[in-house]
Structure formats: C-alpha cells, structure tokens
C-alpha cells in the first residue's frame, strides 16, 4: 500500500496548514518557511491548495484524482462534492468520531481491523460510509487503553453530523455535513479551478 512519507511537521510548515492534527506541528513555523508566504502565480496558489487538501486527508495523487473525477460527475458543486467524498472515508470518520487522535492513527487502526461497520469487519481506510452507517470499536480492541481513552475524551467535542453512543463505543454518520461544519480551512474552489484547466 502506498503511503505519504517524509517528515510530517516539516510538511505542515511547508504547506502552511496543520495536516497531521498534532498540536506542535506548526510550533516552529516562522514567516517565510511555508509556500503560502511566498509570492505565487494563480496556478501555484491552486496547486498549493490541492496539496493541502490531499495531505490533510492523507490521500495519494492517483486516488485524489479519482475523487475529483467523481466530484465533477456529481450533481453537486464539485468543490463541496469533493469534500463530502473525502469526509466520508472510513479513516476520516474514525478520526471524527474520536477513536483516534489523528487521521494517520485512524488509518492504522482501520488497517489493523479494529472496527466493524454495520456489524461487519472493514479494514480498508478508503471505504466510503453512507448516511446512517454505524462504526463500532471491536470488543477485543476495547482492551487497548489508548483507543478507549481517545473515544471517551472526545465525548461532547464531535462534529454535529456525527452521533455517538459512549457505552457501546459506537459512532454514527448521522447526516450529510454542511460545508461550514467540516473543520478544515481550505478553499476548495481553487482546487476546482486547478482541475478545470
């Protein structure tokens, strides 16, 4: 399986966006260290925004391009459709539900088979959830203190399109998110323009 490699904090500073979720990722960022601080052409600005979004969700270029194609073929605005596709990935939902402290950690947990989706084991991070799907931490995985603490510590801080059942270690993709509810600072229209050329 292909992975995004390289120093993660350095990548955050270069992109001018905390794409790993770690509170110290941007700590050493000085003005002038990110591409966002440099004068860029319109193309450069669009490319940077695309790289930011791809890095945030940890998606490889080929897969990201497929998502873009799907977004352009949908009936919704391409930018918002792209965000919805990325947001509904299982690894991201595991993160949003509070089982993991980062999307990267969530991806590892999914790969290792720690979750059931609607009662069935799913170990594919890119698996797309539908509205109403339930994600449950497996019984044997509840013996891992870190997983349990992550979930319980996140109670009350989840995004509004997710509901949780603390006693059952369950998260539910309750409804389609509104754009303003997705907690990522990105200008998706720039990405649409990048792929419209």
From Swiss-Prot:
GO-annotated molecular function: rRNA binding; structural constituent of ribosome
Lipid metabolism as UniProt keyword: no
SUPFAM superfamilies in UniProt: Alpha-L RNA-binding motif
Statement: the UniProt record of this protein carries the keyword Ribosomal protein: yes
Highest taxon of source: Bacteria
Function summary: One of the primary rRNA binding proteins, it binds directly to 16S rRNA where it nucleates assembly of the body of the 30S subunit.
PANTHER family linked: 30S 40S RIBOSOMAL PROTEIN, SMALL RIBOSOMAL SUBUNIT PROTEIN US4M
Family: Belongs to the universal ribosomal protein uS4 family.
Annotated NCBIfam families: PRK05327.1 (NF003717), rpsD_bact (TIGR01017)
Quaternary structure annotation from Swiss-Prot or TrEMBL: Part of the 30S ribosomal subunit. Contacts protein S5. The interaction surface between S4 and S5 is involved in control of translational fidelity.
Entry protein name: Small ribosomal subunit protein uS4B
């Amino acid at each position: 399986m292909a992975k995004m490699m390289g120093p993660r904090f350095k990548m955050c500073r270069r992109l001018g966006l905390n794409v790993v979720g770690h509170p110290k990722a941007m700590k050493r960022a000085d003005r002038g260290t990110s591409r966002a601080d440099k004068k860029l052409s319109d193309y450069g600005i669009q490319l940077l925004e695309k790289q930011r979004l791809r890095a945030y969700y940890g998606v490889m270029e080929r897969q990201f391009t497929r998502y873009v194609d799907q977004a352009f073929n949908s009936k919704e605005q391409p930018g918002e459709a792209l965000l919805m596709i990325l947001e509904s990935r299982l690894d991201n939902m595991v993160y949003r539900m509070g089982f993991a402290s980062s999307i990267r950690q969530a991806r590892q947990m999914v790969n290792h088979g720690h979750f059931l989706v609607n009662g069935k084991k799913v170990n594919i991070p890119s698996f797309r959830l539908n509205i109403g799907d339930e994600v449950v931490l497996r019984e044997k995985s509840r013996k891992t203190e870190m997983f349990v603490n992550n979930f319980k510590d996140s109670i009350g801080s989840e995004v509004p399109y997710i509901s949780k059942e603390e006693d059952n270690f369950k998260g539910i993709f309750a409804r389609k998110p509104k754009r303003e509810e997705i907690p990522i600072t990105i200008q998706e229209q720039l990405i649409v323009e990048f792929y419209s050329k």
